[in-house]
Amino acid sequence: MRPGRARALRQFTLSTGKSAGRNSSGRITVFHRGGGSKRLLRRIDLKRSTSSMGIVESIEYDPNRSSQIALVRWIKGGCQKKMNTIEKFAPPRKILEPTTNTISGLFSFSFLPGKVDKRKVACFSPGLMAAYVVVGLPTGMPPLSSSKSAFASKGAGSTKTLVKDVFFSAFSSPKAKRETASLAFASSFGFPRIAVAGAKPAFFAPRMRQKVRGKSTFSLCEVQKGRTHSILWAHRIKGKAGLSWQSFRRQDTLGLVGAAGHKKSKPKTDQGNLPAKPIGERAKQLKALRGLRAKDGACKVDRAPVTYIIASHQLEAGKMVMNCDWSKPSTSSFLQSAQNDHPKPLFTV
């Protein structure tokens, strides 16, 4: 019996362009080409790697191949599982804890003259106080012994602080909120005027008073690589991750990670100021109709996956077909359960 030439489903058809034997300039390069009825290509499901079972809806004619095609509605195992490659191949997150109790990096505290000293502190538990340093001791004072308490004398001004607290103490202190006091505090302690989280410039010039300036300090004339007074430096700070004074005024206790995340996050545009997009009456009606369908539930559509497969001469409408994935050991049990549920003969594809 010759199948009826019904119109193919639009979601499974695609058209190809025809040149009729002409090139881009319109000249005939291949003779006896062109004309004929328009042929639409059918998408055939040839790469199904899941064990599934379906019912043949109809047998259709395909003008592009000598065999017939069958429209199959899959009732079991039709949807292929999508593997989340990001979660599968993502490496496990590792939390790196500080193992040394010395400060090192691009902006090392050795450049700050006479106020921050690198000293090893007696750690009571491993990994707990490894990132603490002694602040306030002069550089010429010998380190304290491990038998005595490292923070015994309060008159010397030695305190236990974190590394990030040392770096941001000049910015997060209440003195930094006042403009006059902040300049005097930062200039006396030798902190940089602006800290940039990047590889350039490699050095910075601390702002020091004339009384404190000596041989162990850097001057603006010695450091020519930074050139903080240039226009390019201002644009680099504005465009990249320059730490501004306003960000420190907003948050009194701001960590190094928090400052980096605050600068990396892009400001969101104000959606209220943007003009609203005009919505046509047709779109409003469609939305209202969809809402009614969802509430009533009467107009439910069978959304089972439907595909085209190559049909054999024995395949007819209404028969059961089954796709077997023999690479998996569970295929045999799946086939036995399918035969028990449906005693009709199954066609494996």
From Swiss-Prot:
Signal sequence interval, chain numbering: none
Primary localization: mitochondrion
Gene3D superfamilies: Nucleic acid-binding proteins
InterPro entries in UniProt: NA-bd_OB-fold (IPR012340), Ribosomal_uL2 (IPR002171), Ribosomal_uL2_RNA-bd_dom (IPR022666)
Gene Ontology terms: biological process: translation
Intracellular or extracellular location(s): Mitochondrion
Ribonucleoprotein recorded as keyword: yes
GO molecular function annotations of the record: mRNA binding; structural constituent of ribosome
Entry keyword set: Mitochondrion, Ribonucleoprotein, Ribosomal protein
Superkingdom to which the source organism belongs: Eukaryota
Cellular component per GO, a single term: mitochondrion
Other remarks on this protein: A stretch of 270 kb of the mitochondrial genome is duplicated within the centromere of chromosome 2 resulting in the duplication of the gene. The expression of this duplicated gene (At2g07715) is not demonstrated. In Arabidopsis the N-terminal part of this protein is encoded by a mitochondrially-encoded gene (this entry), while the C-terminal part is encoded nuclearly (At2g44065).
PANTHER family for this protein: LARGE RIBOSOMAL SUBUNIT PROTEIN UL2MZ-RELATED, RIBOSOMAL PROTEIN L2
Family: Belongs to the universal ribosomal protein uL2 family.
UniProt subunit comment: Component of the mitochondrial ribosome large subunit.
The name this protein goes by in its record: Large ribosomal subunit protein uL2mz, N-terminal part
Organism: Arabidopsis thaliana (Mouse-ear cress)
